[in-house]
Amino acid sequence: MKIISVGDLHGRDVAEDARGLIGQCDKMIFMGDYVDSFEHTDQQILDCLRTVIDLKKEYPEKVVLLWGNHDIQYLLGHKRHGCSGYRPQMDLMLYTEFTCHRDLFQLAFQHKDWIWTHAGIHDGWWLFSFKYNMGFTNIAAELNFAFDKKEEALFDVGHRRGGYKDVGGPLWCDRLELLNKPLEGYNQVVGHNKREFIERARWKELEIVFVDALHNDDKFVYHISNFKDE
């Protein structure tokens, strides 16, 4: 199993690069935040979102589209889920795009002991804030089920990101929060935290890969995970 992880897009045109790689992997996971930008135009942002939606429709089993916090403010409302870069003139347009294609997106993806979310899962958040135990054996399945139910803890914003919670949930968790105590027993791939280059960090025996490095616009940056599947 070869998985390509692509960091936060924020309106960037990645159509040619993504299509050039899609045949070289088993999964291509986009880490969310397709919208909002201080550099790109409204039309570029809309084109970016429609590009990944088209990719998902064309390769439904191969492409994974994760939700990001910037996407949520249009899907569920800026007043409750607002963040920087909000474009009021695009609110209705992006709400319509996300709502009409909601089933193409998900909060989390899991392969073996690796979990992909936009911002990461903090162990304390999982144990003491989320507490949404529905008997799932798959962490991602439980998170996706909870998202469909709009479980409030999923949208927690920690102090480091200007919120009132001790730590953020999987849409808002800050890098330093995550590195302090990531979810026990699982490696993670996350976006959300801008890095100059893709960063591989370790916490005890666990690995956390930060892939939000696409702001280096001179090249298409992505991370490859290779798994030996039985």
Predicted regions and their residues:
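PAPS-dependent sulfotransferase catalytic domain
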Residues: 88-117
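Core catalytic region of metal-dependent phosphoesterases/phosphodiesterases
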Residues: 6, 11-97
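Binuclear metal-dependent phosphoesterase catalytic core
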Residues: 199-230
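Active-site-proximal loop/helix segment associated with metal-binding centers of metalloenzymes
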Residues: 106-181
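Active-site environment of divalent metal-dependent phosphoester hydrolases
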Residues: 10-15, 36-39, 70-76, 122-124, ...
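A general structural motif
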Residues: 1, 23-26, 60-62, 112, ...
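Short, conserved loop/helix-junction motifs that constitute active-site signature segments
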Residues: 22, 57-59, 181, 201-204
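Active-site neighborhood of phospho(di)ester-bond hydrolases with catalytic His/Asp-centered motifs
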Residues: 5-7, 28-32, 64-68, 116-117, ...
